[in-house]
Amino acid sequence: MDIKFYTEKLAREARESQKFLRRVTTDIKNRVLLRTAELLIEKKEIIKEANDKDLEFAQKKGYSKALLDRLTLNEKRINGMVQVLKDVASLPDPVGEIISMWTRPNGLRVGQMRVPLGTVMIIYEARPNVTVEAASLCIKSSNAVILKGGSETINSNRVLVEILRQAARESGFPERAIQFVDTTDREAVNHLLTLDQYIDVVIPRGGEGLIRAVAEKATMPVIKHYKGVCNLYIDDEADMEKALNIAYNAKVERPSVCNAIENLIVHKDIAEKFLPEIAYYYGKAGVEMRCDERALEILRDHPKANDTEIVPAKEDDYYEEFLDLIIAVKVVDSIDQAIDFIHKYGSNHSESIVTENYTKGMRFINEVDSSAVYINASTRFTDGNEFGLGAEMGISTDKIHVRGPMGLKELTIPKFIIFGDGQIRNNVGIPEDEEIKIDTEKCEM
């Protein structure tokens, strides 16, 4: 395969589909989504067979349990994709929405209208359900999409993309707007990242290494987050039951995802009461606790921590995205120290405080500079679907207009629209002593 020819053709076709996407109605877009949902159910066994091939390959490669979990498309996750498609179909279409409109002193009416980004390339590892979620958002927001999944899910993704394209064909939607990089050759991605004449934005989802490589090589804008070092602070005025449930959920429920906590920060005045209790529950779940000296003093030889693996924390542990049943623990003297700790070690993803003190909670929200900040809730909610966005293209921690989970609106940009009635600037027009003559007769050939 000539990779350069293949990728340029693919990107060019995606770009050319944009002129057809501008004419597609909301009804057609919803029809594609709902037909895809039907086909996912009809072809459930075909999807599972393809996924089994990917899982067999991954097992031979010695992939971790956490990664194998992300690769898996079981009944529950297929049904989850079906629900995502229905949710996105039910959301308002952002394209063409007038964001604002005002009238200038000269009578011009100036406004902003949402329009698609254009061609969006998403590069992702593992999680084949991202194929359907990303495509659904691009379809509803009238963007062309280029899907590049990992080599470990190529069989699953191939089947899912064919289902999406079949739904597009049957619904009168431009099939070329759904492009799939059907090769495991890494040069395909490297070349696509140089095609800024066709691709408007790239969104990488995966490990920090992948995301940094994309950010360094791409010639088009990249919307990203490098890693999810999420922090939970247990304040001295925390409700104990809330604190234990949130700390447990945010680490244990699904440790391999970017919105799980990696650092547990505990105020010194509640540490002796809280740490042994959470250590007991973490121990039952198989969580390893990497503790600073103050936490070690509390937990060392404590009967409730007997079955918990507790080791001294290293400085680097607090920067680490473990994506596993490991948590780093820090005891602090104040909320000030907690906030400073988060700013030093966090990745601006998601942070939470557990406190019954409203003033402290609002201070935490105002001073912690992350894309999602919580009071008395688990960071595991940082997700497009949980936020009511239907699904998400990814999560951005960049200091740009798109920050946090990216839903439909985040896949559009504003276009200025201006309505006039012959206004000209500074009254510079045809000189008054010149007569404007308009020849309405047809020109003779």
Swiss-Prot record:
What this protein catalyses is: L-glutamate 5-semialdehyde + phosphate + NADP(+) = L-glutamyl 5-phosphate + NADPH + H(+)
What are the alphabetically sorted keywords of the record?
Answer: Amino-acid biosynthesis, Cytoplasm, NADP, Oxidoreductase, Proline biosynthesis
Q: Which InterPro entries match?
A: Ald_DH/histidinol_DH, Ald_DH_C, Ald_DH_N, Aldehyde_DH_dom, G-glutamylP_reductase_CS, Glu-5-SA_DH, GPR_dom
> Is this entry keyworded tRNA-binding?
no
What GO molecular function terms would the record report?
A: glutamate-5-semialdehyde dehydrogenase activity; NADP binding
Main subcellular localisation: cytoplasm
The pathway that the record names for this protein is: Amino-acid biosynthesis; L-proline biosynthesis; L-glutamate 5-semialdehyde from L-glutamate: step 2/2
Question: A GO CC term?
Answer: cytoplasm
Q: Which residues form a coiled coil?
A: none
Its subcellular locations are: Cytoplasm
Does Oxidoreductase count among this protein's keywords?
yes
| GO BP, one annotated term | L-proline biosynthetic process
EC numbers for this chain: 1.2.1.41
Domain of life per record: Bacteria
Q: Which Pfam families match?
A: Aldedh
- Family designation: Belongs to the gamma-glutamyl phosphate reductase family.
Function of this protein?
Catalyzes the NADPH-dependent reduction of L-glutamate 5-phosphate into L-glutamate 5-semialdehyde and phosphate. The product spontaneously undergoes cyclization to form 1-pyrroline-5-carboxylate.
Q: Which PANTHER family match?
A: DELTA-1-PYRROLINE-5-CARBOXYLATE SYNTHASE, GLUTAMATE SEMIALDEHYDE DEHYDROGENASE
- Matches recorded under HAMAP family: ProA (MF_00412)
Entry protein name: Gamma-glutamyl phosphate reductase
Source species: Persephonella marina (strain DSM 14350 / EX-H1)
Lineage of the native species?
Bacteria, Pseudomonadati, Aquificota, Aquificia, Aquificales
The coding gene here is proA
